[in-house]
Each structure stands twice: as structure tokens, then as C-alpha cells.
Amino acid sequence: MGVQTHVLELTSSVSAEKIFQGFVIDVDTVLPKAAPGAYKSVEIKGDGGPGTLKIITLPDGGPITTMTLRIDGVNKEALTFDYSVIDGDILLGFIESIENHVVLVPTADGGSICKTTAIFHTKGDAVVPEENIKYANEQNTALFKALEAYLIAN
């Protein structure tokens, strides 16, 4: 099995605590308001804590339509969130899973930095192409910025 790691850092004027609340704790109610149409449907199996599964269907027409996320850990005090993508066409047929570690770090100006480390576990010696990582970064950044704008407005 191959392993590939990628880090995405996004800055925000919104506090780390408020981003964490919207991005992690209340994401299932906030994201549909912040980015209507980002998801076609989300089926949740569990209480939102570790072991919870989120089966996500994305809108028609995109290159990715399905993914299943497993919540691995939520730490409200440390502002960390761990989850894995374990199923769906997002895995492209050559990725076993994508392990994600999210840390919200407060900044001196009252804002925050959202640091996401994605660890791609690939089949054999497969390598995730750079264009796929770029596409994921663009999608994740757009969702983060939509969430940030919603939190600022509300």
C-alpha cells in the first residue's frame, strides 16, 4: 500500500472556536445554509461522535458523486477533528482510504488557521495525480470560504 500526504492551510478572520463549531459540530445544519446545493443528500448513521458514518451524495454532473466519511475523533478543547473517507467514487478505484486530520489554530488577531492533513492510502504503488489533489483543494477551499462567509453574516 502506498501513502501520500498533503497539507492544506486556510486562514480566516473568524475565530477558531466559531469555525470549529460551524465546520465540525454544527456542519450538518450550517453547511446546507452556507453552500446550498453542495450536497444532494447526506445520510447520517450514528450520533456524530467517533464511528459515525456520513454517506454523502453530491450533485449530478461533477466528477465525484459519492463518498462515505467515518468520524474518527472530535476534540472540542483542542479544536481537532479526525475523519476518514472510506468508500465512494471519490476513491477513484485506486485509493483505499483518505485519512484527514483537521486542526483549528487561533491567531493573534482573533482569526484562525484551519490546517488539514490528508493522508491518501493507495492500492499498490498508485500515486494520486496532482490534478486530483488540486481539484480537492479547490472544492475544500470553496466550501470553507462559503462556511466562513455564512458565519460572518450570522
From Swiss-Prot:
For the biological process aspect of GO, one term held by this record is: defense response
Gene Ontology MF terms: abscisic acid binding; protein phosphatase inhibitor activity; signaling receptor activity
The alphabetical list of record keywords is: Allergen, Pathogenesis-related protein, Plant defense
Entry-linked Gene3D superfamilies: 3.30.530.20
Q: Which SUPFAM superfamilies match?
A: Bet v1-like (SSF55961)
Which terms in the GO cellular component ontology are assigned? cytoplasm; nucleus
Question: Which PANTHER family does the record cross-reference, listed alphabetically?
Answer: OS08G0374000 PROTEIN-RELATED, STRESS-INDUCED PROTEIN SAM22
Instruction: State the family named in the UniProt similarity comment for this chain.
Output: Belongs to the BetVI family.
Any idea what this protein is called? Major allergen Api g 1, isoallergen 1
Q: Which organism does this record belong to?
A: Apium graveolens (Celery)
